[in-house]
């Protein structure tokens, strides 16, 4: 069988999930591509047919699929549609996020034919405290394209939709996590929480002279927590700490200086590899 089109569906405030998804799509060789970007708004009653392929890529926040991504996926449905589910995490751990996305996909009428975990630069990563800086890199994107080719081969090898088998994402290989860095991280997180040190609720403009009020941060914020013309303020009730405004500010005026960045940078130096399941 063949897929007549591919639907790339992603939530990607800092563009890492988007990069991975686009590389997978390129690898499939399918030229009819329909993009659904959930970063700024939810999908509008999207039903994907059985003859198409869906690729869904979302970031991991705190070991779970980003809650806003799940909310905006709510109106996406399949009809026994083959789907590839991908989570992108910041080199710490994706925990149960892939299983969470798998459960959602099955409930929404999709058949999960492949799954993957990729690494993207952590939202809290900075030059001073890098966490998976520059990921996905060239090697990651090559692996993503190779994964796309394998997906196409799997679809082509099935004589009909009923012969295209689903996968059990619980069987995906997990990257090895050295024990002592993880133990050190958990110990320091517990100590930080017990200390009562207040944690920043939102990114902020550290040096107001750098802000030109260009409105870029307001435009890229997925939850409208920043208003153009009032860029020095961020609505803490809306902010999801994705740090799109920090990474996308052309003047480098915005910062998010959290002690978690220090811990992540110190404890997760060893770079993890993407893992795939077909």
Predicted regions and their residues:
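FMN-binding flavodoxin-like domain, especially the glycine-rich phosphate-binding loop
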Residues: 2-7, 12-39, 45-194, 257-264, ...
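Acidic, Ser/Thr-rich low-complexity intrinsically disordered segments
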Residues: 175-222
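Iron-sulfur cluster-binding cysteine motifs and their immediate structural context
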Residues: 205-207, 212-240, 244-261
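A short, structure-level motif marking secondary-structure boundaries and short turns
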Residues: 85-87, 193, 201-203, 229-230
């Amino acid at each position: 069988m063949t897929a007549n089109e591919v639907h790339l569906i992603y939530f990607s405030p800092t563009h890492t999930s988007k990069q991975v998804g686009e590389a997978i799509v390129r690898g499939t060789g399918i030229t009819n591509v329909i993009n659904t970007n959930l970063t700024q708004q939810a999908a509008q009653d999207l039903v994907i047919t059985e003859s198409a392929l869906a690729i869904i890529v979302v970031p991991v926040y705190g070991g779970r699929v980003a809650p806003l991504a799940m909310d905006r996926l709510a109106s996406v449905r399949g009809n026994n549609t083959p789907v590839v589910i991908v989570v992108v995490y910041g080199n710490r751990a994706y925990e149960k996020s892939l299983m969470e996305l798998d459960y959602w996909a099955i409930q929404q009428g999709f058949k999960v034919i492949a799954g993957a975990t990729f690494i993207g630069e952590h939202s809290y990563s900075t030059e001073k405290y890098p966490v998976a800086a520059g990921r996905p890199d060239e090697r990651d994107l090559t692996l993503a394209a190779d994964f796309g080719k394998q997906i196409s081969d799997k679809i082509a090898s099935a004589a009909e939709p009923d012969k295209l088998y689903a996968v059990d994402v619980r069987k995906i290989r997990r990257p090895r996590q050295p024990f002592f860095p993880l133990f050190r991280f958990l110990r320091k997180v517990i100590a930080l929480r017990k200390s009562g040190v207040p944690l920043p609720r939102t990114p902020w403009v550290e040096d107001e002279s750098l802000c030109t009020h260009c409105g870029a941060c307001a435009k890229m914020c997925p939850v409208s927590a920043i208003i153009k013309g009032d860029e020095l303020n961020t609505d803490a009730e809306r902010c999801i700490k994705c740090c799109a405004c920090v990474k996308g500010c052309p003047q480098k005026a915005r910062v998010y200086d959290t002690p978690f960045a220090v811990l992540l940078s110190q404890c997760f130096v060893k770079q993890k590899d993407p893992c795939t399941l077909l």
